[in-house]
Structure formats: C-alpha cells, structure tokens
C-alpha cells in the first residue's frame, strides 16, 4: 500500500537502487536507483544528525527501518508488485518516521547522552501492528507502529475538535460512529527500558522465545522481559574489581536463532564466547571460546586493534557464526573452536596504511556484516563507498560501489577493483585515491529475496537483483 505519511525528515524522492547478488564476472548488479538523501545532501552540506547509524529489515522484508545520529527512525514499506513494472518490485517508499530518542544529560556523571540510534531490532509480527526495539547508548525503547484509516465522530461530551462541551448545551443523545479518513501511520512507545547500563549499549538481540531480549554494553550483558521495564537480569559481567586490570570489552552480542538459552558475544581481543544460560544464572564462564592463534610473523603495534571484532552474527540455521574485524570476515563452525573454517579478506590492501588510518581514527571504524537468505553469500562494507560480497560456494568475490555519481535508472553496477601498486588500468582505482570519509558501515539483506540495503553516510541505497 503506498504510504500517505508526511515525510518529516526530508527523506524524499531521490533515487533507489537495484542489484543482483549472483557473483558473475561482468554484469552483476542492476540499479533502479532511487536512494534517499537528506535535504542537506542536496545542498552538499552533510549534517552529522542525518548520518544513518543502523539499517534493519523486518522478518518478512516488507519493511525496512533505519536509524540516524539525530535519534530518528525512518521506516520504508515495500511497494506492491506490479506485473507491468517488474523493475519496481524492490521499491520501498517512506512509511513512517518518528523521533525515537532525544539528547539527554546525566547530571550525576556530567555526561551528555547522545540521541544516536545504535541498533534497531524487529519483533515478529503477531497482528496488524508492527513492533520494534530501538536503542541509544543508555535506553532501549519498544515501539508499536500501526495504521489507522477510521476516526470516531459524534461524541456527546466533546466537540469535533476534542474540546469538552458544556453539558447544559447538550440537547440530544448521539451514538458515536467511525468515519473513514486518510491512512495515518502512528508510532507509539509501549515500553522504555532504562537505568540498567553504566556503559554504552552496543547490541540488542531478540530471543527466539519472543518474550525476552538482551542488551549489551562494554562490560555487561542484561536480559530483559519485554513486558517488564523496571527489572533486568545481569547474565554477563566482565568488569574487573580494579579497572586498571581491564584488558578487553564486549563489542557485540547475539542470541542463537533457535535455542533460547544460547548466545554469543565478541570482544575487543578478537575472541568469541558461546554461553548457555542453563549452566548458571551469571554466564561468567563460557561454554566455548572461539579464538584463532595469532601468527607471530604478522605481529605489529596495530595487531590488537585490527583483531577487535565489530560484529557477530549467527547464520539462519544457527550452525555457524560470522565475525567481522577490521580487515577480514571470518566464518566459524560451532563445533570447531581453534580456527575459523572460512576467512575472507575485505580490504587487505589497507594493511600497509594502518599507520595513517590510526592517525585519522579510521582504524577504529566498526563495520557490520550480513548473510543472505540462504547463507551462501556474505556482504560487508568498506571505504570509498565500496561494499564487498563473497560467494561461499564458488569462492568468488566482488567489489561494488554505492554512489550517486555512477547511478542511473536501472543501470548496471560494474565491479570495482583497487590497484595497490604498479600500472593502473582505466577501470581501477588506486589505493592512494580512496576516500576514507566515505564508508559503508551498515548493511542489511532481505530475509528471503536478493534485495539489500546499504547505508553510505547519509544516503540509503536499496539494490535488487537485475530484471531482464
């Protein structure tokens, strides 16, 4: 259903992109571009509040939610498929937009709390309404998104504007009725989960029982019931008695997709811990520890920084775990703890530039990674608005670029290649020419179709597979 919602964020009709994840050599992705830009982008002024900080499809893929640094959530709805226009089958339009979080100030600690949306997670749809969790650094909120196309009329004690009428002026008794109205999408906060995290929240994950979820910060992971806001259970606590002895922090956490007692969390030291809540209430002792031994020949000043895991994801079956560190994506088998079964180099050509990346703080960027619906393809972002895709079966990979400069309606996205040294071909880009201010940190893949969403700073691109 086309939405008739006022676009309060200025996210309007720019372009939208379309892509195919068949990792062929030449014609790979088509782009029916309609990416969404903020008004400031059109004037070539980028505001930090407009930078997209998270992207997430719902369980059916019909809705796509984005959060930004300004604390806003924008939800896009997929257009109904039109047989006469098959190229528009992956088109999404603005469905609802609302302010999820506001900036706050902690007077006890004299700290500002940013409104930036760190994560969004959808709950499975149970009725006509949609529910999602959004979080900033300190507070998680449960939102209900619902449609309304009727309004009540004919109140006895209220006039048409909702003002209370003088009972003395009421001369007849009316029966209220429902009248049709233009479709309106409402977002209302149903729960607010706060005051449980001392440090910044980096992850939220909904459990497979759909009754609980967990939130993770730098040193602790808490378990919540979706119906209870004033109490949570601490299930992981790695804070040492003496903070000077702190050697690592929690970077990401996720529940197993099917086993409600099992979850994993990653650390800044490059380790992944699998925990079972049935073993103890406080999961300080992990069930399994996944860690790859470091090659002494590759040891450097930056080794610990680039080994920090920025994202961890179970595959759909729950058999494998995917992790992303600064230079690589790794796939781990739950039955093999000592090394990953697959390692993919995302941008190994940056290894010689780690010193300059450290100086400009880019080495601390946190890239996410996603599976496709069948777990056969992996996607993650890079610099220069590049994103990488790896086919696990054919072992082929491709680098693609999300940018307005090379976007035309239903154009074909050509693979890009980075040249490290020597003579550069016409279609290659030198590693020295990469723009490190243009980075793709956040991506999402439709749960069942070849449709992906890519956030490039304050632009959102949506790609679908090529339509002949």
From Swiss-Prot:
GO terms for molecular function: protein phosphatase regulator activity. Keywords: Cytoplasm, Cytoskeleton, Membrane, Repeat, WD repeat. PP2A consists of a common heterodimeric core enzyme, composed of a 36 kDa catalytic subunit (subunit C) and a 65 kDa constant regulatory subunit (PR65 or subunit A), that associates with a variety of regulatory subunits. This is Serine/threonine-protein phosphatase 2A 55 kDa regulatory subunit B beta isoform. Disulfide bonds: none annotated. Belongs to the phosphatase 2A regulatory subunit B family. InterPro entries: PP2A_PR55, PP2A_PR55_CS, WD40/YVTN_repeat-like_dom_sf, WD40_repeat_dom_sf, WD40_rpt. It is found in: Cytoplasm; Cytoplasm, Cytoskeleton; Membrane. The B regulatory subunit might modulate substrate selectivity and catalytic activity, and might also direct the localization of the catalytic enzyme to a particular subcellular compartment. Negatively controls the initiation of oocyte maturation. WD repeats lie at residues 47-86, 112-153, 196-234, 245-285, 304-342, 359-400, 435-468. It comes from Xenopus laevis (African clawed frog). One of its GO terms (cellular component) is cytoskeleton.
């Amino acid at each position: 259903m086309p939405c008739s919602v006022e676009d309060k964020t200025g996210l309007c009709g720019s372009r939208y992109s379309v892509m195919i994840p068949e990792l062929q050599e030449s014609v790979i992705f088509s782009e029916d571009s309609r990416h969404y830009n903020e008004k400031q982008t059109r004037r070539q002024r980028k505001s930090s509040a407009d930078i997209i900080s998270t992207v997430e499809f719902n369980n059916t893929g019909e809705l796509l939610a984005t959060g930004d640094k300004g604390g806003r959530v924008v939800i896009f709805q997929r257009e109904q498929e039109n047989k006469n226009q098959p190229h528009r089958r992956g088109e999404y339009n603005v469905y609802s937009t609302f302010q999820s979080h506001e900036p706050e100030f902690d007077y006890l600690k004299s700290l500002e709390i940013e409104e930036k949306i760190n994560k969004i997670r959808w709950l499975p749809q149970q009725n006509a309404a949609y529910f999602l969790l959004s979080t900033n650094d300190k507070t998680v909120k449960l939102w209900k998104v619902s449609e309304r196309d009727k309004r009540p009329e004919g109140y006895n004690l209220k006039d048409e504007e909702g003002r209370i009428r003088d009972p003395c002026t009421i001369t007849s008794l009316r029966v209220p009725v429902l009248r049709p109205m233009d479709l309106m999408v409402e977002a209302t906060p149903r729960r607010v989960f706060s005051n449980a995290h001392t440090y910044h929240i980096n992850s939220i994950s909904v459990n497979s029982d759909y009754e609980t979820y967990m939130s993770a910060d730098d040193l602790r992971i808490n378990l919540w019931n979706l119906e209870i806001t004033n109490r949570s259970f601490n299930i992981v606590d790695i804070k040492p008695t003496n903070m000077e002895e702190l050697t690592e922090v929690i970077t990401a956490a996720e529940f197993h997709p099917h086993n409600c007692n099992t979850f994993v969390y990653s650390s800044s030291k490059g380790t992944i811990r699998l925990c079972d809540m049935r073993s103890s209430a406080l999961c300080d002792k992990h069930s399994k520890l996944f860690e790859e031994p470091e090659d002494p020949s590759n040891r450097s000043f930056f080794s610990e920084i680039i080994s920090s895991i920025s994202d961890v994801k179970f595959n759909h079956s729950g058999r494998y775990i995917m992790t992303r560190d600064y230079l690589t994506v790794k796939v781990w088998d739950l039955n093999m703890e000592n090394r990953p079964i697959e390692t993919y180099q995302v941008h190994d050509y940056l290894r010689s530039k780690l010193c300059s990346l450290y100086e400009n703080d880019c080495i601390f960027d946190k890239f996410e990674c996603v599976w496709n619906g069948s777990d056969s393809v992996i996607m993650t972002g890079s610099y220069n608005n590049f994103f990488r895709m790896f086919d696990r079966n054919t072992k082929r990979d491709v680098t693609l670029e999300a940018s307005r400069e090379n976007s035309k309606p239903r154009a074909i996205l050509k693979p890009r290649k980075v040249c490290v040294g020597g003579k550069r071909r016409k279609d290659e880009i030198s590693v020295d020419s990469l723009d490190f201010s243009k980075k793709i940190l956040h991506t999402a893949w439709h749960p069942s179709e070849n449709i992906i969403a890519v956030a490039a700073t304050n632009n959102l691109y949506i790609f679908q597979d090529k339509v002949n």
